[in-house]
């Protein structure tokens, strides 16, 4: 069973293309026009073992907001498309990831109910030119279009780069766990309702 998807999103602000393979090896080709976002998408691909190809052009002459948010939206749509009816998936995933002084926890549920709890007490407003608030916009876009519940907690950290990077690495690992096929649950929906 192939769990690949390709989604494009074209608006007056951005043009986004995301292609992915949930059963990949972490290969990636990333060109969003926002270098720090490319760095974070690399974390998702490598730690989630998702092959990821993302290209984006956007109104970055204004700021990076629309590009970052729309990449999150398009990635969410692609994951939802690739995962299909969710039969046989583990459904839940979680991960703790440290990076030096920083530690983050991410928990995901492919519930079909979009919800985001994002608790990251950033220690500064920017990492290089990247506005740290855009990380929540990325995950909000993802959650609303993948149909997942996502809890993100940075438990400690002093360096804002480390805070964000641990979040994206933990997200990749939690995603990998949740979308794995459980051989004991082949062909069944992981819910007592029989639907997600």
Swiss-Prot record:
PROSITE patterns: IGP_DEHYDRATASE_1, IGP_DEHYDRATASE_2. Transmembrane segments: none annotated. One of its GO terms (biological process) is L-histidine biosynthetic process. Its main location: cytoplasm. It catalyses: D-erythro-1-(imidazol-4-yl)glycerol 3-phosphate = 3-(imidazol-4-yl)-2-oxopropyl phosphate + H2O. Belongs to the imidazoleglycerol-phosphate dehydratase family. HAMAP family: HisB (MF_00076). This is Imidazoleglycerol-phosphate dehydratase. It comes from Ralstonia nicotianae (strain ATCC BAA-1114 / GMI1000).
């Amino acid at each position: 069973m192939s769990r690949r998807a390709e989604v494009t999103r074209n608006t007056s602000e951005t043009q986004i293309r995301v292609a992915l393979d949930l059963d990949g090896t972490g290969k990636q080709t990333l060109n969003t026009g926002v270098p720090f976002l490319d760095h974070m998408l690399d974390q998702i691909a490598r730690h989630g073992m998702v092959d990821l190809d993302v290209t984006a052009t956007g109104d970055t002459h204004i700021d990076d907001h629309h590009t970052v948010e729309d990449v999150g939206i398009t990635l969410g749509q692609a994951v939802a498309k690739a995962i299909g009816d969710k039969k046989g998936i583990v459904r839940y995933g979680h991960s703790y990831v440290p990076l030096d002084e920083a530690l983050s926890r991410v928990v995901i549920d492919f519930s079909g109910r979009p919800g985001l709890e994002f608790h990251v007490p950033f220690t500064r407003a920017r990492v290089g030119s990247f506005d740290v608030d855009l990380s929540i916009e990325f995950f909000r876009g993802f959650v609303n279009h993948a149909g997942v519940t996502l809890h993100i907690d940075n438990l400690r950290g002093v360096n804002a780069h480390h805070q964000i990077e641990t979040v994206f690495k933990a997200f990749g690992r939690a995603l990998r766990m949740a979308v794995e096929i459980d051989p004991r649950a082949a062909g069944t929906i992981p819910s007592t309702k029989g639907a997600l």
